Amino acid sequence: MPPTEELTMVLVTRQDLQLSKGKLAAQCAHASAECVLSAKKSNPRSLDQYLRRGARKIVCKVPNLVSLKQVHSRAKKAGLVCHLVTDAGHTEIPPGTETVVGIGPG
């Protein structure tokens, strides 16, 4: 990868859920951790570079579940590391609610 390119992880959240800041942070952390574990298997050199350069992340929002699933589908089709978080339902939202998509690093 050229030195000017930065590896980035993108976290895409659902705006319609109106999660508390803490819940949203936890869901993003789940997505990030799963993406790192996947990247460790699929591209450990890029993951190492990503971590050494500060593990840059960008958080974006989509309006609803349909949009979240579209983002996830496109990331998978593009061959990117990605993970769709499904909540366990212990706190704010029902079990099985899909909350965040993590994409990258890449």
Residue ranges and their predicted role:
Residues 18, 48-51, 94:
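Generic, ordered loop/turn and secondary-structure boundary motif
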Residues 2-42:
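Glycine- and Gly-Pro-enriched alpha-helical subdomains that act as flexible
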Residues 10-12, 53-63, 76-106:
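Short basic, glycine-rich beta-strand/loop surfaces that mediate nucleic-acid
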Residues 66-73:
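Short amphipathic alpha-helices within nucleic acid-binding modules
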Residues 15, 43-47, 89:
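Glycine-rich, flexible loop/turn motifs
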Residues 22-24, 71, 95:
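Short, well-ordered secondary-structure micro-motifs
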Residues 29, 34-65:
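Compact, glycine-rich, soluble single-domain proteins
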Residues 26-29, 73-77:
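Short, solvent-exposed amphipathic alpha-helical segments in soluble enzyme
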